């Protein structure tokens, strides 16, 4: 019998695990958060928001793991990858794979530890939030859920089909031949709306529906596109939309037009609370270096200036240290860059 696990079953992983379990497939939900795991064991996974359901699930802490898994869906913070992936390597079946559903560009680092033939990447195009132990909110509209999945060299067609079928128990899975392009497209969305959402202390809609924030957002998008292109990436469509055609500009007129499109494009995802903001609220370090920070990193390497992303990193790090608090007033900290 095949064995499946979600490692780092927080908000996204609990929602995904509930869908997969409800469909009749067995999967272990694993998290270091003992209160969350105990609540899942006692009450099942309660999902609110775009859907309402409570599903009995199999939940474990890492010290309760045993045996080998054929597929491990990885949803921990990328900050911990070296430690986590090295730990998971011992629980991976000989032909098993780690499928990273994380933000940023995580595949190369994982492949260094377990091999490219055991590494797959998946872009998550929906959001969720942990409300309380055992309770998660699906914050994207139910008709806008999807995955974009690609594979690295050495993954068999059979293994790819197996993972695809597993994830399709929740929502459509698009086979992505341009995984790097899909990663950069998701990075653009995260850098803009998770980055700025964290700065202003709000959900994606607080960025997309604010005139002041949109002025910053469109410039953040352009920086991401410029850097991605300089790094050799061809941006993949996001849920059928060509984001470079929609949001890239070279003239003030196109910039104004693209800015107007932001709230329309983000309408179905307006309620997503940035995972970085969720981390700050819990007093945890966030993934700013793996999101906006990676844009800045590639910008420097490719000779592309990234003043908006640099400022987002600076502000979020100040929020981490307590020197600043995420709030709407923080958008004024970009005025000198506009």
Where are these regions (language model features)?
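Nucleotide donor/acceptor-binding cores
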Residues: 2-3, 70, 145
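Active-site-adjacent beta-strand anchor residues
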Residues: 6, 30, 74, 100-101, ...
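NAD(P)+-binding Rossmann beta1-loop-alpha1 motif at the extreme N-terminus of oxidoreductases
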Residues: 1-52
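Rossmann-like NAD(P)(H) cofactor-binding subdomain of soluble oxidoreductases
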Residues: 52-137
